[in-house]
């Protein structure tokens, strides 16, 4: 989701289908 998109900046290991 969109949340993961922001999380990936702090936690690159976390990526959602919406990320990227």
Swiss-Prot record:
Top-level taxon: Eukaryota
An example molecular function term from Gene Ontology annotations: hormone activity
Feature: compositional bias, Basic and acidic residues: 8-20
Protein keywords: Dental caries, Hormone
Species for this entry: Rattus norvegicus
Name the record gives this protein: Dentinal fluid transport-stimulating peptide
Function: This peptide stimulates the transport of dentinal fluid, which is important for the prevention of dental caries.
Record region (Disordered): 1-20
């Amino acid at each position: 989701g969109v949340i993961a998109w922001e999380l990936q900046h702090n936690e690159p290991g976390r990526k959602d289908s919406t990320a990227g």
